Amino acid sequence: MANRKRDAGREALEKKGWWRSHRWLVLRRLCQFFVLGMFLSGPWFGVWILHGNYSSSLLFDTVPLTDPLMTLQSLASGHLPATVALTGAVIITVLYALAGKRLFCSWVCPLNPITDLANWLRRRFDLNQSATIPRHIRYVLLVVILLGSALTGTLIWEWINPVSLMGRSLVMGFGSGALLILALFLFDLLVVEHGWCGHICPVGALYGVLGSKGVITVAATDRQKCNRCMDCFHVCPEPHVLRAPVLDEQSPVQVSSRDCMTCGRCVDVCSEDVFTITTRWSSGAKS
């Protein structure tokens, strides 16, 4: 029998203990705050590890790291980025293409803790979804952004990009960007479940495309143990990606959809240990 959304993870907590039912969540938060700390170490302590922001930065003032979407906007607008920016975009593209799927979204993005909190509160207080929007709208928005950059000759998305706004706000103090971040929080809390990360964000859409053939993946390797509690579906930002691997015994157990954020919450909250984070070449992930 399916559990209530507000009870998602309770069985896992009772059966596996706190650490094993929160392990991947804790590791993600540590990674997110570690990256943020590398940005903050310069302005706060004068030790520049990551110099810049989430759109473009230098690691130890040497290794460039550039958001691929910003680079595509620059190319679409007719402006060839500097060699260092192109190099940074290549580094990030290769890194996430090899690693897999939307690891940036769940392990690096500073907005992820905000949207996770909104959706935890939504489950906790049994708030019903008040609107429905198609998940493919993020890909439409991605195309619109590139067309808009081509037509205006500007990096049109960077005017309102909440990921870079969040990063700058944390480094330089919250200003008008805080209103946009608050709006996204309320949107996820009151309007559409997992609305930003699961439906709209064009940054996540691009990383999903780039990492669709990457190494790291989630697999329902022991799906025969599934008791249909549905906790994994309740906590997953992209629950549609679990449908075939978990419920269709004729489908491969590997979560192959590029929408998967590889966040590991399905692994955490499953009391029967159905899921594992593995590689796409693992024999268990292919079965």
Positions of predicted regions on the chain:
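Non-ligating segments of multi-cofactor redox enzymes
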Residues: 1-253, 258-261, 265-287
